[in-house]
Structure formats: structure tokens, C-alpha cells
Swiss-Prot record:
Top-rank lineage group of the source organism: Bacteria
This enzyme's EC code(s): 2.1.1.199
Any GO BP annotation: rRNA base methylation
Protein name: Ribosomal RNA small subunit methyltransferase H
Residues annotated for S-adenosyl-L-methionine binding in this entry: 35-37, 55, 84, 105, 112
Organism per entry: Streptococcus equi subsp. zooepidemicus (strain MGCS10565)
Function comment: Specifically methylates the N4 position of cytidine in position 1402 (C1402) of 16S rRNA.
Pfam families given in the database record: Methyltransf_5 (PF01795)
Main subcellular localisation: cytoplasm
Molecular function as annotated in GO: rRNA (cytosine-N4-)-methyltransferase activity
Amino acid sequence: MTNEFHHVTVLLHEAVDMLDIKPDGIYVDATLGGSGHSAYLLSLLGDKGHLYCFDQDQKAIDHAQEQLKPYIDKGQVTFIKDNFRHLKARLLEHGVTEIDGILYDLGVSSPQLDERERGFSYKQDAPLDMRMDSQAALTAYEVVNTYDFNDLVRIFFKYGEDKFSKQIARKIEQARAIKPISTTTELAALIKSAKPAKELKKKGHPAKQIFQAIRIEVNDELGAADASIQQAIELLALDGRISVITFHSLEDRLTKHLFKEASTADAPKGLPFIPDELKPKLELVSRKPILPSQKELMANNRAHSAKLRVARKVRK
């Protein structure tokens, strides 16, 4: 694996094996990233199987073209550089109207976190950016410097679940009135200064939740995941499966809600029987989320918050 795009794949075998791979199936890796899941999935496919890989980061696709070359040479891989919110439309362009399985590994990939200039990390000094797609218009700089007080409070509380959202938004408002806030370390210092001393003694970086909130806003992560997972459920063939790995409670709650909605009969209570068209579309493969093993947690610190949910299509 190239040094500039090093990524340790989380829940590698669990997420792929739970898809119950058919050798001649059509599959989608909605979040190509470091291509670890794709490489393992492709190793389970026969010559007639095919994998469509989505990523909005050109560097991820360039890296995967090296890593997956043997499968590319056999014509088994198609790369789609786009946000996975356009899943259905982009697959349709390739003549795909039904898939046997799809995998999501939500959140920021390790290379994006580790590339200082991308501005995702509060640990390294960099311009405020946080775009997963470097061609996108909205940046963290614009969020921090142009959103009004109420909008900042809204995203900090909604996406960061930080109880000091108002105090942090006020600090930002005061600081940017003097000069724009332009770097990650400037922002991290402001966040830290807005929190009481006893809060700073707690485990974890004081800026973590606010950086998460800004990143989610910049990339509309929850909106994209919501739209894409709903499209994926529709695209699944009968007995097809969907695996979703999440890294924070907002993503997990969204996935749990979408799976519950699709796995619950849409029928009024008291009916003597449920018509086929009102029966659930999904069946949960595992009622509780699947967590990384102790061995994986020891080997990869970033796996600690990971959860995997899997469902199977039972009605078209």
C-alpha cells in the first residue's frame, strides 16, 4: 500500500462476509476509500462478478487503480467518481438496475484525516477546508466565518452534540469580528477557550465534536447517507444484502432508523393478514450492531467507535 494513501480497513471480513457474496453477483462499494473492502470482495467474485466503486476523492480512485489492477485488467471493476447520494442515477448510466449487495464505510477515511492540508484534523495546523470532494464549493472556512450565530449553534448541537455549542459559537463570532478564522489550530484553540476547566480534564480532545459537526455540514454527510441508503434498499435484488459501518451515533441512529422503517410492515393494526405490498422490504441479519473484535481494537485504534449493521432484501 502506498505511503501517501495508507488506510487500515475496519471490520473487513465481517462487513464483506455478511453480504453472502455470490461469485457472479453485481456489488457496490459505496465508499471506496483505501480499497480494502473492495479488494477482499473482489477476491470472492468469479469471472462474471462485477464491483462498482464510488468515491468523490480522486486520490482514493488513483490509489485503488494500483491496488485493484489485477481485477481491473479482467474487467471486473468500474470506478464512479461521485458522491454516493447519486447512487441510483450513476448505476443506471451503466445499465445497472439491480444489485446483489452494497457496502458503506461511513465517515472520513484515514488518508483524509492524515493529510494535513485537507484540514480535517484539530491536531495539525492547516487551512480550514474539510471537503471530501476537493472540487466542492462549501468549505469549513466559509461555515466558520459566514454562518450566523444561530446556524453555528444549530450545527454544533445537532451534528456535534456538544453541550457548550452556544458558548463556542459566541467565541467564534467575537473572534471573526476582529479577523477571519483561517486555520484548524486557531479554531481548536477558540473551542478550547470556550469550555470550562473541568470539561478540559475529560478524555478526548475538546474540539473533536465541533470539528465533526463542521465536517458533516460541509459534506452534508447525513443527508447524503440518508438518500443513498434509501436508494440502495430499492436497488437490492431479492436476497441481496446491505452492510453499513458507522463511526458515530448520528450515522448509527440514521442507519438503524432506515433499516427499522424498511423491516417493519406498513400495515394498519388489526388486519387479519398483511398484503404482500405492505410486507417489510428488509429483514435484519443481526438485531444488534456487530462490533470489532478485541484483536482488531488492539491493532487499530480507529476501530473503537465502529458499528456494523446488516440487512437482507425480502420483498421487491
